[in-house]
């Protein structure tokens, strides 16, 4: 069981690292924060706590995806609609 949790954590880290490439404050900022967050919990051994942390990481993934989607939507809206009000 611990081995499957380990692989889930590694998969989560890689996924977050990939998503962090487009982070508004920069990829280096995101990478440092991500590494610090994972190192803070590296000694956790309780499987239930690890599952909670994985769930939190998946929530962060969803938030990042929403952030990127909204950023792209706003850029597209600026291109096609003027802010001039009659």
UniProtKB/Swiss-Prot annotation:
Keywords assigned: Mitochondrion
The GO cellular component terms are: mitochondrion
Where mainly found?
mitochondrion
Where does the record say this protein resides? Mitochondrion
Which Pfam families does this chain map to?
Answer: Complex1_LYR (PF05347)
According to its UniProt entry, the protein's GO biological process terms are: negative regulation of oxidative phosphorylation; respiratory electron transport chain
The keyword Nucleus belongs to this UniProt entry's keyword annotation: no
Family, according to the entry, reads as follows: Belongs to the complex I LYR family.
Describe the task this protein carries out. Acts as a regulator of the electron transfer flavoprotein by promoting the removal of flavin from the ETF holoenzyme (composed of ETFA and ETFB).
What is the name attached to this protein's record? Electron transfer flavoprotein regulatory factor 1
Highest classification ranks of the organism: Eukaryota, Metazoa, Chordata, Craniata, Vertebrata
């Amino acid at each position: 069981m611990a081995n499957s949790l380990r692989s889930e954590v590694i998969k989560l880290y890689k996924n977050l690292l990939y998503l962090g490439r487009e982070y508004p404050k920069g990829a280096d900022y995101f990478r440092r924060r991500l590494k610090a967050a994972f190192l803070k919990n590296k000694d956790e051994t309780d499987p239930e706590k690890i599952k909670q942390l994985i769930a939190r990481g998946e929530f962060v993934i969803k938030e990042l995806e929403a952030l990127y989607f909204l950023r792209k939507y706003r850029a597209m809206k600026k291109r096609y609609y003027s802010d001039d009000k009659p």
